[in-house]
Amino acid sequence: MGKVASYVLFGAMAMQLWGTTRATRDIDILIDPTVENARRVLAALSETGLGLAAEWLADEVVSKPITVIGDAPRVDLFTVAWSVQYPEAAADAVTFDLEGVPIPTASIEHLIASKRTGRLQDAADIEVLEELRRLRSLP
């Protein structure tokens, strides 16, 4: 068996796994920004039906902060999620089980940090995440 792709789920899909009802049309994934890992991520996306992922070169993916793949669903591959780097996100990630598949998901703290963009929707998300953190009695 080959190596597994290294990633952490971010964005609204991560918020949903934490228990919010935030709607979204995309999947935000923070990846370990190495060429080898980007190859594994692109291969995994291709295997799951996102054939457009096969058209991207791993070198291209790691050379920029975000790569958008596909349309429905749209997958946004991040090499940095605003101020959050992969190593710190991976170290603090919480794994959720989604239909038998373990999904490494950004901590509430890292979700909040990734939402400090100044956009109105992100400001609203921060309020929801801070309330969720309070309800779960998380630091």
Q: What does each model-identified segment do?
A:
Residues 1-139:
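Compositionally biased terminal segments of proteins
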